[in-house]
From Swiss-Prot:
Signal peptide: none annotated. It is found in: Cytoplasm. It is an enzyme of class 6 (ligase). It catalyses: tRNA(Glu) + L-glutamate + ATP = L-glutamyl-tRNA(Glu) + AMP + diphosphate. Belongs to the class-I aminoacyl-tRNA synthetase family. Glutamate--tRNA ligase type 1 subfamily. InterPro entries: aa-tRNA-synth_I_cd-bd, aa-tRNA-synth_I_codon-bd_sub2, aa-tRNA-synth_I_CS, aa_tRNA-synth_I_cd-bd_sf, Glu-tRNA-ligase_bac/mito, Glu/Gln-tRNA-synth, Glu/Gln-tRNA-synth_Ib_cat-dom, GluQ/Sye. ATP binds at K241. One of its GO terms (cellular component) is cytosol. This is Glutamate--tRNA ligase. The lineage of its organism: Bacteria, Pseudomonadati, Pseudomonadota, Gammaproteobacteria, Enterobacterales.
Amino acid sequence: MSKIKTRFAPSPTGYLHVGGARTALYSWLFSRHNKGEFVLRIEDTDLERSTQPAIDAIMDGMNWLNLNWDEGPYYQTKRFDRYNQVIDQMLAAGTAYRCYCSKERLEKLREDQMAKGEKPRYDGCCRHGDHNHTPDEPHVVRFLNPQEGSVIFNDKIRGPIEFSNQELDDLIIRRTDGSPTYNFCVVIDDWDMEITHVIRGEDHINNTPRQINILKALGAPVPEYAHVSMILGDDGKKLSKRYNAVSVMQYRDDGYLPEALLNYLVRLGWSHGDQEIFSIDEMIKDFTLEAISKSASAFNTDKLLWLNHHYINTLPAEQVAVHLDWHIKQQNIDTSNGPSLVELIKLLGERCKTLKEMAESCHYFYVDFDSFEETAAKKHLRPVARQPLEVVRDKLSAITDWTAENVHKAIQETAEELEVGMGKVGMPLRVAVTGAGQSPALDVTVHAIGKARSIARINKALDFITDRENQA
């Protein structure tokens, strides 16, 4: 058996969205599972809509997801000479022909067909001769599609699919301006690049019989095809570049880990028993095209969030820290005076479902705050909190070995000494050192903030209570 070779071939007319990312992932996994090769190809024949920022966004998305490619990126715009060479060979061989029909004639033909309730299609007017035209007159080149029989291909996901050749008109393969068309470029690329399996969205099913006929006319091998069903949004509507689809890099910006998004995307249409959590190695080991569902998959943001929380807490903290660092920089936080990012992940991992949330909620570990959160201060920084704060401050000041255990002991001893519940000490202390009413466990929080900073903040809270008393 020849080496398996797949490709991901996005059009750079927008960012890489989740549908494209899932297609790329499936193609990548299939090649890796079979120890084959994965090709990245940029289908930029739409010269008006293809942009360099979109190409950059695709590359950024692929790199962030760690979907590495073995060949490419290839650009179709750099291969126009090759496409035109093949078209000229087809003209000479009689498998393509020049069409001189005017735009007006084709529009009238379309209107007449639609008025009769017929499917609009080219009527083959120029199929059997040039009708006294010369090659230097404006024309397109059409593929001479077979008029009898049918095209049958065995879709690796959907099973046998058949199209009658009578339903397929003669496809334009070169425009009037001399540029080759998308459907033709794809065929030549897959042939030249020796692609064995084409894995793509179900919106390409209708292109497949036309592409197979061109390959057969060229005497080229026909690859296997697998058409993946669409993804529906949380609202049940189709995700597309132009509607409701979120860029892969937006998920990065929103604080998701690539491991979480990959795990989510692989399960969005593919399954292996009832397993939900997959490492990359497990995906590669277990992935098959036959296990992909024919049905549309519904995107569920809550499930992605659950997976992200899982990976924040189960991946090595050092690995998560690499991604968290980007979000910390977005918040302009200097982490040199506070816990390391690895420590921060261990502190906040259980509480935070995204890295963005973690970066936004960690400021008090590194930066002194100007004011207390109003509701928390009103409830917990009252005159009754003065004594617990003063006693716990003095006990914290006396600690020579600054550990979370000794911090906990100081809080506990304060409660016992004053004969009050832990909450009567803990909540005022929490608001004093963090500025708010919520944080990880108080002993590890105070320990991470540091001795000098914690004591200074307790003193600030005591001043706040004094000011409050004076204003009463």
